[in-house]
Amino acid sequence: MLLCCDASADYLATATPIQEARYVTLGGIEQWITIRGADRANPVLLLIHGGPGDAQSALRSTYAVYEKDFTIVQWDQRGAGRTYLKNPNSPPEPERVELDGIELAKYLCSYLTKKKILILGHSWGSYLAIGMVQRSPELFAAYVGTGQVGSWRANVQTQFDFMLAKSRAANDRKKVELMEAIGTPDPTDAEQYFSWWSMRNPYMPRADKKWFDDLKLMIQTNPEFTEEYLKAWGDGMGYSGRTTLSAMLGEELPTNARTIKVPFFVIQGKEDMATPTSVAVQYFKVVKAPRKKLILIEHAGHFALVTHRDEFLAALVKYVKPLAIKSERDD
């Protein structure tokens, strides 16, 4: 035990922590980032949030567990959080956001003295992160997806079948009649999609329900959630959703992104229905990458990154972190 304490003390004595939060210029506008970690020598993990517009930078305590092993970079994209607060008329068009992200990755490599960084995309962010990796694979030691998107068409059909089965089992005649009248869902019809998917709350995984309850409490107690910021956060998600809707309705990564030139990992909640795990697995199977691995987390839903942090971190440390360390040693 004393040896363990001595080792920990030695680590703390030699570590160089980093805690920064500021605007940087990306794509010609000021965008908000935070950089937090226990030691600048650790691999850099750039988080690409979903939503669209669901900035995570204010949720510092939620992601603190990752900071011992990684330097965590949160980025409020165009249309999100503090970036939206400063630039309310800069639409988060996917191509533009991907180019912003590549610019940020280059900045992080330079500023933090890394040859490559790790990238983690959640939900809609997995779509953007895949785009970034395809455009500039040389910047990334590995890709990690969670709440991984795949085929939007398959996504909609899987969700529809799930909702209809649950509604029938619950004898919810209103939902059953609505969905039976639709018959086969049209993946290009956003209004139709939201008419039935908006009624999903009773059937959400328990872990996701708890996350939303925890988030409400955090918003009430977190000093970063000022009235101004909270309004920008909500308005940004609405703005981002409207701007990116056409791209979301056309997501077909199994067709458009089959070849990934960096190690490819999917760490997915087994009960995810927002980006159905079965659809994510279908995409994973067709991807060709130098190395790939699928990790399913039991009892987790769409937000495994924050609801099952210990399991998620263990997977990152075991499978992903070594690749980032190796990339720094390679010539």
Regions found by a protein language model. Name each.
Residues M273-V279:
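Conserved alpha/beta-hydrolase "acid-adjacent" motif
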Residues E98-K116:
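Conserved acidic catalytic loop of the alpha/beta-hydrolase fold
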Residues P52-A64:
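The serine-hydrolase catalytic nucleophile loop
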Residues R173-T255, V262:
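Alpha/beta-hydrolase
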Residues E67-L85:
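Conserved alpha/beta-hydrolase
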Residues E138-D186:
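A catalytic-pocket lid/entrance helix-loop region that shapes and gates access to the active site
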Residues I260, V266-Q268, D272:
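Short beta-strand/loop motif that positions the catalytic acidic residue
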Residues A300-L313:
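Catalytic histidine-centered segment of alpha/beta-hydrolase-like enzymes
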